[in-house]
């Protein structure tokens, strides 16, 4: 990072909690957040079932809050000289360690709640159509979960950013391409396979 790459600040921050916080801020903030976001985005396509939106939102809030509460105090401790890999520390760092510990528990609960909600929805979640998010890109035109060959008929290619090209089909309970909304031009409908 910028602080650890500059000699004037790295001399002070080297081998402190700042290094620990920076590493975990990048890895948890970038990797874990992307993993959870990708799982929630693709879950309906993978399983053909929708996750519990409330559990997803609560899990997201807890992960975000716990993540910042865990690692932000470590930046402060490191900038104040708290070395890493020490079992004991000065009393001035006690409150920061306590907040960081509370944040770790909140983060863990958020991750656990998110995964429990996803696993539960894979078996008990409400069935969803092939396009529950009104997405205009090609992958959302195949069934959820996708068939072995993905498409039975030639898919309609639209601009992936033209969200007005999608209309809601109440019979299928999903969004479909506007071109398929007209029965004269639509291919035969195929109901999603039961699980």
Specify the residue positions occupied by each region the protein language model found:
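Hydrophobic membrane-spanning alpha-helices of multi-pass integral membrane proteins
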Residues: 28-33, 59-72
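Histidine-centered active-site/metal-ligand motif
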Residues: 22-24, 195
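Divalent metal-coordination and catalytic microenvironments
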Residues: 24, 65, 75, 115
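Juxtamembrane membrane-water interface segments of multi-pass membrane proteins
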Residues: 1-19, 35-59, 73-95, 116-135
């Amino acid at each position: 990072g910028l602080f650890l790459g500059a000699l004037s600040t790295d001399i002070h921050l080297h081998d402190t909690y700042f290094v620990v916080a920076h590493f975990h801020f990048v890895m948890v903030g970038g990797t874990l957040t992307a993993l959870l976001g990708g799982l929630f985005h693709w879950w309906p396509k993978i399983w053909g079932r929708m996750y519990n939106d409330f559990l997803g939102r609560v899990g997201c809030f807890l992960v975000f809050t716990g993540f910042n509460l865990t690692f932000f105090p470590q930046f402060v401790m490191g900038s104040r000289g708290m070395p890493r890999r020490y079992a004991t520390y000065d009393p001035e760092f006690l409150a920061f360690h306590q907040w960081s510990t509370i944040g770790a528990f909140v983060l863990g609960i958020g991750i656990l709640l998110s995964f429990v909600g996803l696993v539960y929805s894979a078996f008990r979640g409400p069935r969803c159509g092939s396009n529950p998010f009104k997405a205009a890109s090609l992958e959302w035109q195949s069934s959820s979960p996708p068939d072995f060959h993905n498409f039975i008929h030639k898919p309609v290619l639209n601009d992936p950013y033209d969200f007005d090209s999608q209309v809601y089909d109440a019979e299928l309970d999903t969004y479909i391409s506007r071109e398929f909304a007209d029965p004269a031009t639509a291919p035969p409908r195929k109901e999603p396979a039961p699980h």
